[in-house]
Amino acid sequence: MVSLSDRLDYIVGAKAADSLDEVFGIRTVDDLLRHYPRSYTKGATVRGAQDERPEAGEHITIVDVITEAVTLPMKKDSKKKYLRLTVGSGRNKVIATFFNAGYISKGLTKDTRVMLSGEVGFFRGVMQLTHPAFLILDSPDGRNRGSSSLRRIADASQAVSGEVLMSAFERRFFPIYPASTKLQSWDIYACVRQVLEVLDPVADPLPADLRAKHGLVSEDEALRAIHLAESESDRRRARERLTFDEAVGLQWALVTRRHGELSESGPSAPPRSDGLMAELMRRLPFELTEGQREVRDVLSDGLAATRPLNRLLQGEVGSGKTIVAVLAMLQMIDAGYQCVLLAPTEVLAAQHLLSIRDVLGPLGMGCQLGGAENATQVALLTGSMTMAQKKKVRADIFSGQTGIVIGTHALLQDAIEFHNLGMVVVDEQHRFGVEQRDQLRTKARTGIMPHLLVMTATPIPRTVALTVYGDLEMSTLRELPRGRQPITSNVIFVKDKPGWLDRAWQRILEEVAAGRQAYVVAPRIDETEDPQKGGQNSRPSETADGLYARLRSGELANVRLALMHGRLSADEKDAAMMAFRAGEIDVLVCTNVIEVGVDVPNATIMLVMDADRFGISQLHQLRGRIGRGTHPSLCLLASWVSPGSPAGRRLCAVAETMDGFALADLDLKERREGDVLGRNQSGKAITLRMLSLAEHQVFIEAARDFCTRAYEYPHLGLAPHPGLADLAARFIDTDRIEYLGKS
């Protein structure tokens, strides 16, 4: 008999096993049985005159007599031939085409009774099948001839007389699998049938009481029913069980990672009443919100503990995450540790340097004239710095003079040595992976696992928080600091109302005349980038270079413009941002390089060109660059799509709410599940086969509860079955999280 871990070549044959491995990476019985059907089709039928016609793309299986069989030359190469069959007549006529037919044409002749199976198309109202699977049902010598998959099923179900038993094909439903031209659905079905006929009863990885609590069928029943059950209710119960399996596997991988990190020793840093953190609290020119105080206290308690803190801080744009992180870093510095803040771009890293130095004042001027007695240093380390600059920063870090190091990916590759690293802060977590944030933690002293705080201004749906970030505890800032100004958002559908775009340029001029500043955002840098990337129409999208050149002599000819995008050198980007921040530039023409972290309080209006080319979360992030000062702000989303299109409705949804959490839920419903989890260490995408983060919150929460209790409280009798590790296997080595990077 056969178990789930057995290789397929001993069961289905080397040729079929090699094809499954080559096309889908399917190697074992478990791999094959978890290659679930994508849909189901009715069994083989003789179509009647009154039968409803199938829809294009539907998988059909028909039995009928060939009324015409013609071999014709290919148009592009007359030496090559193709076979065209006509079966049935009238509205049920089907034309089947076989290219490079060769030996196929010998058996498929007029008046032969055949079975054809494939995806149906239509041409001039006639049903079409291209290279369908086929089976000759009245072969003169009684041998089964046809596609290997159908032939194998026919051979296995043949009567003593040699006649094909049609009952094998007349089931109410057949599974339709994700397939390819090389490996069709019938091929996969034949292998599945062959495996299930010899498969031993499958041991259940979940305890009986858990299955009973959630009304789940057994693993063995589910794996068989998902492929062979003819009843939809049986298939539904199988899907529920296999969905729960996937939720448990994912949560077990996450709880294993989480507790693996917690087993390390963390740098304990109790708060000091005479330290930098307490002094900054006394000097702050504003009051923290209630939410900020709560998160500060949670972080303070975590930093004082002897196990490493692992926490995600999410909050709306402008909710004040940075000051909370600064207070946490000062608590670590008070205890003799250093901190590193990892930012995704040099623009954001430079912004953090300015804002943190500004909020610290003399407390951040260590070894400088005018610095406080116990002041620390704040330093920047990026890839564009000169070797001499990097050498000076490295020396101050190694000596311990620098308490807060701010940098980009350069921190990961740089030969930097810390005097005593105690905390890693990662800003905009979705731009980094697990392996990158952990790479910094390895720069601490042996035996110490630095505390970890990761931050994002992109709100995260609860189901994503429980999965993608399931190895982290979570804090949320929803309350905006007092004084944040409202942002009005409007969509400009340019095709319908071209005059509104003219008015948008006029509004920018009005804001500039009032002494304020503006952003104009384009989806591309220049014409070398794919004009259709993310688009829904044939019109090439705007470019930052093109807009900048046009606006200088056109709509914004009389204002001071600057250009900002990712291909500029670090010095050019710094110069543009410094000039814009200083008020020397009126309008910044840019790409989404300003999506995160850029803080210019005097900027009050933003025009996003071809807004449909941006994701929901990107638009919400971009909009957060305005409304940061004392004046009400306006965000205009210009698009050439129609209002009723999916892209148009998405833009309207963004314009109608400033609730980033509501937009995050909408974003999750629209994206493919495969974008959520990222890739494993071999680079293969981690995809969800059954589990939907948008639809299965109940399953995800139940799985998290079970896995957490089973891991943390084995004395309660929740010790997991051995099969849990198998469910978690494809998630356990996930080393790169990409959920929000694709938003």
Curated annotation (Swiss-Prot):
Gene3D superfamilies: Nucleic acid-binding proteins (2.40.50.140), P-loop containing nucleotide triphosphate hydrolases (3.40.50.300). GO terms for biological process: DNA recombination; DNA repair. ATP binds at residues 315-322. It comes from the Bacteria. Residues 524-545 are annotated as: Disordered. Residues 44-171 are annotated as: Wedge domain. Keywords: ATP-binding, DNA damage, DNA recombination, DNA repair, DNA-binding, Helicase, Hydrolase, Isomerase, Nucleotide-binding. CDD domains: DEXHc_RecG, RecG_wedge_OBF. Residues 302-477 form the Helicase ATP-binding domain. Transmembrane segments: none annotated. The wedge domain within the N-terminus inserts into the replication fork junction, where the lagging and leading strand split. This is ATP-dependent DNA helicase RecG. It comes from Mycobacterium leprae (strain TN).
